[in-house]
Regions:
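Non-cytosolic beta-sheet module surface loops
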Residues: 9-13, 150-153, 202, 328, ...
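The feature marks proteins involved in alpha-glucan
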Residues: 1-13, 39-146, 188-273, 278-297
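Short proline/glycine-enriched turn/loop motifs at strand-loop junctions of beta-rich domains
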Residues: 13-17, 151-157, 577
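Substrate-binding/active-site clefts of carbohydrate-active enzymes
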Residues: 275-454, 471-483, 487
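Hydrophobic faces of well-ordered beta-strands that scaffold small-molecule active sites
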Residues: 270-272, 324-326, 388-390, 459, ...
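Short, surface-exposed loop motifs enriched in S/T, G, D/E and P with embedded aromatic residues
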Residues: 29-38, 171-194, 198
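Beta-strand-rich binding/interaction modules
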Residues: 149, 154-175
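Conserved alpha/beta catalytic core and glycan-binding cleft of carbohydrate-active enzymes
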Residues: 241-246, 476-655
Length: 657
């Protein structure tokens, strides 16, 4: 493995020609290395640190030939999975910078610009100057299409149009965009000085496009539109589609009293979490081969297994649940197997937030198909009286450096450290900054798009504790204007250090967010036990003395956390993360008979569904789904599985009484 590092070095005096580098890694002797070119920052060197494995860090010194001059030892931290690390070093400054803008703000830099990194470290002033509250993306009409991109730090932006919607199509036209001229820091609807736009006469339906953003005169990157609603199959180019081409037959958006499937009392909700691919991928599902693992597999009817029992959509309709929750259905990073087919992926790798995932559609190369098919799914569940909740992941992006956000306005949309590295409260390499005006706007615009365009009935926020309270309350307020019965809840874990504790949308701050729900891990652990970093703890159903916590959970958990109402409490004993209930109880009680084991599972589910609050479960929990081994021969449901599912069906009906 090369473990490549690009080093940019700036000398205030401009003395470069006598300089070289000394590079090394732990446990190995060092060697000389040399600068190979110059750029506007200074000298540039391309280094490799060959090793049979990924290096988490490496070292370098800048020196002259005889070591009369040398810098401090620079330790370069490398992000796992990123093949090439780029750093900026400044003469006299011991800091390793991971952003050019952060390095230019160093007082040791020859042409120091103290405001160069304001978008990261002084965002309130940056937002006041550059914030914009108008529409972004594209607006289509048959006679004219307009494009808008917010890119205040860009020196120039061009619109790139492609010859077709094929991901390999050649460039057809390159058109200059114009920067807005109006500066209005107190009225952001009119503050266009950071917005680039262009209007094109003619019909641009089904045209692929991207933006070419120039950071400096000759330095640019091409990026998809952050506000894209359709993309090429690989997600790298955006596509204009006329609204009338995105309405499948029979689909209609209904809100308020017209949305008769929504619940007036959220505490009656029974939420059923599932993954699009998992739902129908098995050959035992009875779903037609073409639809297995796809959006269409969610609604195919008449499916049966080898025993003649109803499966998939027909089965879900028989359960008595009120909501399904779909694990991420937006466009996420795509992995492929050896045959070039889409590989299994939970979907928590966001790339295009407003675009349905290509891997779930019958034809990823036809950009409207995935939109139409997802709308057909939502309509079918609404017709069956079932709400559809969307699992959203606004807390991080798959790539830090290659996301549309970073390519458009570098270092703005994320929480950054002073040295230009990304904060990583998500554990995924970065965390977004919901407290900044334009990412808050993006989150809200995206949520409203899914609500108004797809008729989504609720949103489950992944790692919600990384978002700020004001943003989450704003989302709740705007959804209330549409329909207050739309659910908003999430993972209120305390993660990251980028926000003050009192600003985090974590469960300990539940009283500050009265219309938002939180997963109740206190109740979960008290009832079933827990697996924490490889160690296991028993809960009530395994004989642990947690009666006090269980009693408080039954009464609404407000003595455990400052919940305002039971509807803020999401009670559960199984979700897609960690051990399934069935597996955990086998680990905690390995000597149980099958009969005793089933009774423990049933007790955990029954206790939880009858507690005050909203009930949440994972697909298959009702028939002892396992992550470790199949329950029946050839992955078939056994008679015992069907009996257990029947037991849950009774419980779900009790919940709605």
């Amino acid at each position: 493995m090369d473990n490549a590092v690009i080093v940019h070095y700036h000398s205030c005096k401009g003395h470069y020609f006598q300089l070289s580098l000394w590079q090394w890694r732990d446990g190995k002797l060092g060697k000389d290395a040399y600068f190979s070119r110059f750029d506007s920052f200074g000298a540039v060197a391309y280094l490799t640190y060959p090793a049979p494995y990924f290096l988490s860090h490496a070292y370098v010194i800048v020196k002259d030939q005889f070591w009369h001059y040398q810098t401090v030892d620079f330790r370069i931290e490398r992000d796992y999975g990123v093949p090439k690390t780029e750093v900026w070093l400044v003469d006299g400054d011991p800091t390793v910078y991971y952003s050019r803008q952060a390095a230019v703000a160093s007082r040791h830099y020859g042409r120091c610009d103290v405001h160069a990194f304001d978008m990261a470290v002084n965002s309130q002033a940056f937002d006041k100057r550059w914030g914009f509250s108008g529409w972004l993306g594209f607006r289509y009409q048959p006679e004219e299409t307009s494009f808008r991109l917010w890119a205040p730090t860009a020196e120039k932006v061009e619109l790139i149009l492609y010859a077709s919607t094929d991901e390999r199509a050649s460039v057809a036209r390159v058109l200059p965009m114009q920067r807005g001229q109006q500066y209005s820091p107190d009225h952001h609807a009119e503050n266009t000085c950071g917005v680039w736009d262009i209007s094109l006469r003619g019909d641009y339906n089904y045209h692929a496009y991207c933006y070419r953003v120039y950071y400096r005169r000759r330095t640019f990157r091409d990026t998809r539109d952050p506000y894209a609603i359709a993309t090429t199959a690989n997600g790298k180019r955006s596509i204009v589609i006329a609204p009338e081409h995105l309405r499948p037959q029979g689909f209609s958006v209904k809100q308020g009293k017209e949305a008769t499937w929504r619940l007036d009392n959220p505490n009656q909700a029974v939420i059923y979490e599932m993954h699009v691919r998992d739902f129908s991928k098995s050959e035992t599902s009875g779903v037609s081969l073409a639809n297995r693992g796809k959006f269409k597999g969610l609604i195919e009817t008449g499916t049966r297994n080898a025993f003649g029992d109803s499966t998939c959509f027909d089965y879900v309709k028989s359960l008595g649940i009120t909501h399904i929750q779909l694990q991420p259905i937006f466009d996420h990073h795509q992995f492929f197997d050896d045959n070039g087919d889409y590989a299994y992926n939970w979907g928590y790798d966001p790339e295009n937030y407003n675009v349905p995932a290509a891997s779930f559609t019958s034809n990823p190369h036809e950009p409207a198909t995935r939109i139409l098919e997802l709308k057909e799914v939502i309509q079918a569940y609404h017709d069956a009286g079932i709400n559809v909740i969307m699992d959203v992941v606004y807390n991080h992006t798959y790539s830090s450096r290659e996301s549309a956000f970073q390519l458009t306005v570098p270092d703005y949309y994320y929480r950054m450290n002073p040295n230009g590295s990304f904060q990583n409260g998500s554990g995924c390499g970065n965390e977004t900054a919901s407290e900044k005006e334009m990412y808050r706007k993006y989150m809200l615009d995206s949520i409203l798009y899914w609500t108004n365009e797809f008729n989504i009935d609720g949103f489950r926020f992944d790692l919600m504790g990384l978002h700020d309270i004001d943003t989450m309350n704003l989302i709740r307020q705007e959804l209330d204007k549409i329909d207050p019965r739309i659910l908003v809840f999430g993972e209120g874990w305390d993660m990251g250090v980028g926000l003050a504790a009192e600003q985090k949308a974590k469960k300990e701050n539940a009283s500050k967010m009265p219309g938002i729900g939180f997963f109740n891990d206190d109740q979960r652990n008290a009832v079933k036990g827990a697996e924490v970093y490889g160690s296991f703890e028993k809960g009530f159903v395994s004989g642990a003395p947690t009666e006090g916590l269980v009693a408080k959970s039954i009464l609404g958990s407000d003595e455990l956390v400052s919940y305002c109402t039971p509807s803020q409490v999401i009670n559960y004993v199984e979700a897609h993360d960690n051990y399934n209930l069935n597996d955990l109880l086998w680990v905690l009680n390995p000597e149980d008979s099958k009969q005793d084991h089933v009774k423990r599972v049933q007790l955990a589910s029954a206790m939880t569904i009858l507690m005050q609050g909203i009930y949440f479960m994972q697909l298959g929990q009702e028939f002892l789904r396992t992550k470790l081994y199949p329950t029946g021969q050839d992955k078939e449901l056994t008679q015992a599985d069907r009996e257990r599912a029947g037991y849950f069906c009774l419980l779900s009906r009790i919940k709605r009484l």
